[in-house]
Curated annotation (Swiss-Prot):
Keyword Transport on entry: no
Protein's name according to its UniProt entry: Large ribosomal subunit protein bL27
GO BP terms, alphabetized: translation
Species per Swiss-Prot/TrEMBL record: Mycolicibacterium paratuberculosis (strain ATCC BAA-968 / K-10) (Mycobacterium paratuberculosis)
Family per similarity comment: Belongs to the bacterial ribosomal protein bL27 family.
InterPro entries: Ribosomal_bL27, Ribosomal_bL27_CS
Annotated spans, Disordered: 1-21
This protein's UniProt keywords: Ribonucleoprotein, Ribosomal protein
Pfam families assigned to the protein according to its UniProt record, in alphabetical order: Ribosomal_L27
GO MF annotations, alphabetized: structural constituent of ribosome
Entry keyword Lyase: no
UniProt cross-references to HAMAP family, sorted A to Z: Ribosomal_bL27 (MF_00539)
Superkingdom of source: Bacteria
Length: 88
């Protein structure tokens, strides 16, 4: 077997950069409209009230308020509780 492969071949690719996925704002944190809450592949978390979903499944705040994680019908959901209701 040859140790040298030829003029134009490469010696394996290199490691790719991480995608920086995950939860960016945790439960109880205050967010403004447009802030990213979760970066994900697929819908590990589903959008609830006050939360939108981008084309790459990123969840973002549609309104200002406190982030709230919960479970609805067996799915993990993310909601935004308006600032006035957060004290309840």
């Amino acid at each position: 077997m040859a140790h040298k492969k030829g003029a134009s071949s490469s010696r394996n690719g290199r490691d790719s950069a991480a995608q920086r996925l995950g939860v960016k704002r945790f439960g109880g944190q205050i967010v403004k409209a447009g802030e990213i809450i979760v970066r994900q592949r697929g819908t590990k978390f589903h959008p609830g009230t006050g939360v939108g979903r981008g084309g790459d499944d990123t969840l973002f705040a549609k309104q200002a308020g406190a982030v709230e994680f919960g479970i609805k019908r067996g799915r993990k959901t993310v909601n935004i509780v308006a600032a006035g209701q957060a004290a309840d």
